[in-house]
Amino acid sequence: KTALSQSKFDMEILEAGAKGHFYLELVTREEDRATGREEEMEQELARIFQGIQAGEIRIGSKKTRGFGQFKIESIGEKNYTKDNYLEYADAYDEARWENCENVLKEWLDQSGWIPKMVQIEVPLQLKGGISIRQYAARKGEPDFTQLTDHGIPVVPGTSFAGAIRHRIKTILQELKNTGATLPKEYSEIIDIAFGYVDKKRACSSNIIINESEIKNAKQLTMMRTGVSRLESAVKDGALYKEKTYVDGKLSLKARVKKGKCPEDEKWIIGVLLLALKDLQNGFLAVGGQTAIGRGLFSADGPIRIDGKEGLEDTYIAEAIKNMRMNGGGK
């Protein structure tokens, strides 16, 4: 991915922890109850609520990179019929809902929820520092600081996704060079896994990577001199102050959508796990200033897939199995 010329833009986001509420209306007819359609609609609504709780239904942009996830804290419900239709005039009055019974559990219990994503969790230990910069907004602050959310250093899903995407591309190229027959061209595999926009055609990413908080990290402020990337020499008068974090722990949480074709799901998970293994072993750096050792990690525990440990080798073997080696059959 490369930057577009003259395409810089600003955007406003809501930080984690913001709260709000929304209203939802379900309109049913008398015949819906007789035919069972009312019960079906309620169950579909319950599945939507469960999908939100599970993090599989998100809102807004950059949903596949950790944005737009929220939790339902409570659900209040009111029924309006021909006997009390006048009360509907106050349906959107917040005060009317303050003492309403919380029926969230009842709705979730009737959902019959079946997860539509495979969840992968990778515990990581930060080796040294990390540099995902935000620039100073006030006088007297360091020129560059590590990106934070409510004062907690974070690694955004976009940073992880960019590094992992590039590593998967390298892995696929190496597999092809060793004689493997890929299920599709490696560029098409990347597009399916990470999404694409091609004029009027587009596909959202099948891999979702959340923002990760770095816990128990030590804050470090240092003075540095800028270096010319063309000459590899010190720039004159380019002294700057930087605030970074070192030696913390974090958990990378990724999801892979379950599609109509199970084979696609298997090889997507397989090649993703190969890249995550490189991340755990310190072969893949994330963020900026990687040339001076920033953004490297080590394993802080086993990879968990849908809450179970020790499954990654099976998924990787399945991915390789779907690729035919020269002279090895299918």
Question: Where would I find each of the regions flagged by the language model?
Answer:
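Small/polar/charged residue-enriched interaction surfaces, especially the RNA/DNA-contacting tracks
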Residues: 1-330
